[in-house]
Regions:
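Non-heme di-metal
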Residues: 1-155
Length: 155
């Protein structure tokens, strides 16, 4: 959520039309942290310990780089991150949830986030395609491609 809020605040006036997309995306993503914590608890984990935990170094690097790029370079680059995360989720979430559940014998309730995102993110990918197709500035396209390349490496 903080990355989306930073994106919305940093979008230049020439991209004012994308602000509604960012607001819609914020509404869509709100509460997803709780879904993950619910799944951790359903799998027998400690939701409170998970909420207090710190991210691994790769996750921290990915988020920090995206934040820095939004704040200091070109905020449009954020859509490169969305491309990687939503595209990966749409492609892998449902199969991944099934494989993990079968291997570990966990209940259905431990996979609400992954299973919902396997479906939701397919719609997000379509929305993202519309956004990407609206970007014609070569600097914007280069910025989102650069962040996408970096995030593929860290993700």
């Amino acid at each position: 959520m903080p990355l989306l809020m930073a994106l919305g605040a940093r979008l230049p006036d020439r991209h004012a039309g994308l602000r509604n997309n960012v607001l819609h995306y914020l509404e869509e993503e709100n509460g997803h942290d709780d879904w993950i914590l619910n799944d951790i608890e359903a799998a027998g984990g400690d939701r409170h310990a998970a909420a207090r935990s710190t991210p691994n170094v790769e996750t921290e690097a990915m988020v920090a780089y995206a934040w820095d790029t939004i704040m200091r370079r070109n905020p449009i680059s954020f859509f490169g991150m969305v491309f990687v995360l939503e595209g990966s989720s749409a492609a892998l979430a449902l199969r991944g949830a099934d494989a993990i559940q079968n291997a570990l014998g966990l209940p259905d309730g431990a996979f609400s986030y992954l299973r919902s995102h396997g479906t939701l993110d397919q719609e997000h990918v379509k929305d993202l395609a519309n956004i990407l197709n609206s970007l014609s500035d070569p600097e914007d396209r280069a910025a989102l491609a650069a962040l996408r390349r970096y995030l593929r490496w860290t993700y």
